[in-house]
Amino acid sequence: MISYEYCDSSDSFYFNDIQDFDFNPWIEVKSVSEKGRCVFSKKFIPKGTMVFRDIPYAAIVDNQFKRNICTTCFKILLESNRHNFQTCPSCFQVNYCSNYCKQYSKIETKHTELECKWIQDFTVSFKHQMAEDDRNIVLLVLKILARRIHEKQSTIFHNKPLTTNTFETCTSNNNNIDLLPMIPNDIPDLIDHLDDYFINSKNNNEFENEEEEEEEQEQKGEGEQEENENNENNEKVKKKVIIIDDNEKEKEEIKKFNKIWKNDFKRLINIAKVIQIIIDDSIDSLENIKCDYGFVDNQGDTEMVDNSIDPKGLDKLVDNLSSSDLNILRLLCKIRANYFGLWNSAYKPIPLNSIDDDDDDNNNNKEKPNNDYLWCGSGVYLKLSLFNHSCFPNCTTLIEYNINKKNSNNNNGNNGNNNSYGDTNQLTISIITLRDIEENQELLITYIPLNQKINDRVKSLKSNWLFQCDCKRCHFEKINENQTEKIYKDSCCTNQKCSGGLLIPLEQNSTQGICRVCKNTYTLPTVFYPLK
């Protein structure tokens, strides 16, 4: 999922107590057939309205930016404030902009002793073997597990097996998404796609067997037809060609994504096994333990996985999953399906090896940010996970540490006592309406970058979230790819050097919108046909 920044004054929005769905004046959660939990408007909502806020359950700075961003406040580590930098003396993988942030760290970013130990083990034994995205999701899962153990919470995410059959266990009614509470208040309440992966793995094999039988029957039928064909029959066959071609395209599409999902499933199983090894106290040494699939070799090259073919050994991996493996795999799938990206201004990153005080070439943030944003971290937000996706969303997400960036940057020289935040959680994400929303209309955000063609958007959503987008933009672009181009571009920043995306209303009912990146303002469109 993608979350965006908003670097204007927080006075643009009225901060109601809107963190509780039960008392929220604007929105409510409903269950919709074939979609599950959705967020709908209780009444008419003007554009530019802040309708919801949520704090993360856990959040991390991504591995490649760990020397650039404070773990607590997610503020850029400015070179002028280097004398205040703090680093964990044990794992050397967690950094703070000040001693205050190190001590002030809230539970969602708190670096516990257990997490520190796990990070050390992961760094020594596995990190160099894994791709960047996989490293980050492992770190996020480890932080969640460490928090739950620190708070003496349950670490059971997968229901106890009712049978020795792994497939039956994972697809049993006890793991049915219909049994999840309407409002997620804990990690186990989050939806995951583990059952879908298991079902696809099983049904994919059956699908291929049925396809082979159909091909044999077709070949047999073609042989008989060749013996008895005549001109009249040939004409009938020609009329069916278009229908047959459409069916073949649909089958090929299903086969393609089945193989993508199976390869992804194997990767997730192996990541879960890595996590299980790290947290297993019974293993004395993690040296010489090798990752098995899609990881980085000794030369630093990522293994190329061909998603167009079935992965080898998946059936054996599934059959050998223990109850502990299933539990971690369930947690991993919940996190992967629900985490939000935390974005920040694009600065020159510090090299990951070390920082040389005398080497000015390695100094960070001497340059001004360019008109771009970087995915610099990840967070799990329990209630924000209820908002569904659209390729032309009527809402956007804004991060608190960017709303208050001006104030926080003025406190870099405060001898490391950056207490300007007070009780405000800098990782709070707010939902802002981009357009007027009618009563009983679903509120939607985006999970992906929107400046992509429909085929790329479909592939991204089906590969990562296992669903076919049926939003109006996709519907009309299937008919004519250019049909929605004008209204989409009219709703975005027109600065060619900017990647800001959809404009955000300056305030409630405003006719002007601001670009989240370059800060230019434009007149907002009033006609959204055919997407309204």
From Swiss-Prot:
State its Enzyme Commission number(s).
2.1.1.-
* GO cellular component terms given for this protein: nucleus
Q: What does this protein do?
A: Probable methyltransferase.
Q: Which intervals carry biased composition (Acidic residues)?
A: 207-217
- Coiled coil ranges (UniProt) are 199-240
Q: Which key words tag this protein in UniProt?
A: Coiled coil, Metal-binding, Methyltransferase, S-adenosyl-L-methionine, Transferase, Zinc, Zinc-finger
UniProt lists the family membership as follows:
Belongs to the class V-like SAM-binding methyltransferase superfamily.
Q: Which GO terms describe its biological process?
A: methylation; regulation of sorocarp spore cell differentiation
What PANTHER family would the database entry show? HISTONE-LYSINE N-METHYLTRANSFERASE SMYD, SET AND MYND DOMAIN-CONTAINING PROTEIN DDB_G0288495
Q: What protein is this chain from?
A: SET and MYND domain-containing protein DDB_G0288495
Q: Name one Pfam family in it.
A: SET
Q: Where is this region: Disordered?
A: 204-234
The protein's GO terms of the molecular function aspect are: methyltransferase activity; zinc ion binding
- Please state, per the UniProt record, what induces or represses the expression of this protein: Down-regulated by phagocytic stimuli and up-regulated by Pseudomonas aeruginosa, PAO1 strain and PA14 strain infection.
Q: Residue ranges of the MYND-type zinc fingers?
A: 70-116
Q: Which cysteines are joined by disulfide bonds?
A: none
Task: Give all residue intervals belonging to the SET domain.
Answer: 25-448
Its EC top class is: transferase
